[in-house]
Amino acid sequence: MPQYNPPLRDMQFVLHELLGAADELKLMPRHAEIDADTLNAVLEEAGKFAAEVPAPLNSPGDAEGCALDKATHEVRTPKGFKEAYARYVEGGWPALSCDPAYGGQGLPLVLNQCLYEMLNSANQAWTVYPGLSHGAYECLHAHGSPEEKRLYLPKLTSGEWT
């Protein structure tokens, strides 16, 4: 069975040596306390999650696929996908770069991009589920009315809605 090995050193090279991310983040008031150790710790945990949770579901998920129950109009996802999403939510990953005003962690978006790079590499089919939700979050956060933000963003941030 193929194994996913997250490219942590490559990501650390880009973040630290190429972009100087920790120094750049210090110039941004909301991220001034984020240092290289914090960036590395989040990358390591994201890599561990990607390798241990969605990656093992990649081949079995492709083989099984989704199925529509025509009687109930419900879609059944491959075995393990629902549990993997529950672990994603439990780990706080939906909230990683989301606004703390809506329950997010407020970490830099660059970390969210690294997370999604690893998730897509580990299991692109599974990653569509949280990825679409994060896109909806970003759209509403940028363009939603105050009422839409109040209604939708906390549920998307927590992972309750996907």
Predicted regions, residues:
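Amphipathic, small/basic residue-rich leader segments at the start of a protein or domain
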Residues: 1-127, 147, 151, 155
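Phosphate/diphosphate-binding loops
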Residues: 137-162
